[in-house]
Amino acid sequence: MASQGTKRSYEQMETGGERQNTTEIRASVGRMIGGIGRFYIQMCTELKLSDYEGRLIQNSITIERMVLSAFDERRNKYLEEHPSAGKDPKRTGGPIYRRIDGKWIRELILYDKEEISRIWRQANNGEDATAGLTHMMIWHSNLNDATYQRTRALVRTGMDPRMCSLMQGSTLPRRSGAAGAAVKGVGTMVMELIRMIKRGINDRNFWRGENGRRTRIAYERMCNILKGKFQTAAQKAMMDQVRESRNPGNAEIEDLIFLARSALILRGSVAHKSCLPACVYGLAVASGHDFEREGYSLVGIDPFRLLQNSQVFSLIRPNENPAHKSQLVWMACHSAAFEDLRVSSFIRGKRVVPRGQLSTRGVQIASNENMETMDSSTLELRSRYWAIRTRSGGNTNQQRASAGQISVQPTFSVQRNLPFERATVMAAFTGNTEGRTSDMRTEIIRIMESARPEDVSFQGRGVFELSDEKATSPIVPSFDMSNEGSYFFGDNAEEYDN
């Protein structure tokens, strides 16, 4: 997708920068990553973690959550105004796992939020470094995307569980800024908007008064973000209708659900970034890597290279398969929860199996789980090839928006053809084309019907050897097209519940 003049690159959003050239972008992303790494090293020192304990992904997640909580202004203010049982508004903490006498022990720690934010700022040259915080949020969001299914959330908002591939970033906090908005899927934006409209239907004052004015601005901004993800004029026009509605109600919800369905064929532009756990950056900084000087990109070879020589461990429950745990984390690291499994398998160099076949639960360990039986193992996060992350959704040409790949939101810019039965998707569009958006609906359906399954996404794009850092000789994989490669089919994963 040719970048429009108005769009900043994702790295620029990531670092809050204005237009910069590639070198400047690489340097500022590097500065952000280096800051996370320095913070992590300092926290390991504070907590007196051994080298092994510092490489434990569960400890990394606790430390990341602590700093995110320390900087969550809104929640901190809310906690101070509504003192609830057992929540100290000034402190944050979580489980830290230590290896003692050959056993893993859980220790609950508590720190002053002020102390944590001081350490964070100190690691980031005295700045708030919001970009680094957002980066960690996106890593947590990618981990949730790979771990949980959102069927219940989809059904609650009147959407169809088959739309799960549109739900990237559905657990990202509202405060995740432009970089967060870029990685949200079409379904996620639709769901946020529907929730908002439903509140407006149930609460007469939602759109009224000073608060209502702010709500309205937020509503229109979310509509514009979603509009920016669509690539056809008809879809964009329909979003204008939804945005300009005097008082949004059921008609708008209908329109949004229609648009979400249409995104199964006419893919939205959703960014993908490889965001790694803080401990990986910490390890690299500790071994003397200067991220700012070397530069870093979230969408190129750098994260692959970092994972090639990082050893990260994970706690494993008694009946979990360590190889499956590794796959889960690998997918999260590369934001590949919604990628075609055949593409992922080729890049990883190991078969990536659908989630219903994984013998592993989430990475985080609940506080009531028995530590006696916990073991730990090395996560295998290396890959055979690397590929450029995409932000286009993989439609072959924007002018007549051909079919993107159903049940998949491509992560890697790698050529694949489109295994789908258009009839099954088109069945979702029978019936209602009347109402004020009828001409747009008709147009969208027409575009989808003329989308040719024999079109190829990412024509000529391939994967690269890990030695080919300049991406000079693409290897275009050929896939067995007999099976549709969705991670979510035949799924029995746990639901994501806050």
From Swiss-Prot:
GO terms for cellular component: helical viral capsid; host cell; host cell nucleus; ribonucleoprotein complex; viral nucleocapsid. Residues 1-23 are annotated as: Disordered. It holds the Pfam family Flu_NP. SUPFAM superfamilies: flu NP-like. Keywords: Capsid protein, Helical capsid protein, Host nucleus, Host-virus interaction, Ribonucleoprotein, RNA-binding, Viral nucleoprotein, Viral penetration into host nucleus, Virion, Virus entry into host cell. GO terms for biological process: symbiont entry into host cell; viral penetration into host nucleus. GO terms for molecular function: RNA binding; structural molecule activity. A motif (Unconventional nuclear localization signal) lies at residues 1-18. A motif (Bipartite nuclear localization signal) lies at residues 198-216. It is found in: Virion; Host nucleus. InterPro entries: Flu_NP. Homomultimerizes to form the nucleocapsid. May bind host exportin-1/XPO1. Binds to viral genomic RNA. Protein-RNA contacts are mediated by a combination of electrostatic interactions between positively charged residues and the phosphate backbone and planar interactions between aromatic side chains and bases. HAMAP family: INFV_NCAP. Encapsidates the negative strand viral RNA, protecting it from nucleases. The encapsidated genomic RNA is termed the ribonucleoprotein (RNP) and serves as template for transcription and replication. The RNP needs to be localized in the host nucleus to start an infectious cycle, but is too large to diffuse through the nuclear pore complex. NP comprises at least 2 nuclear localization signals that are responsible for the active RNP import into the nucleus through cellular importin alpha/beta pathway. Belongs to the influenza viruses nucleoprotein family. This is Nucleoprotein. It comes from Influenza A virus (strain A/Swine/Iowa/1946 H1N1).
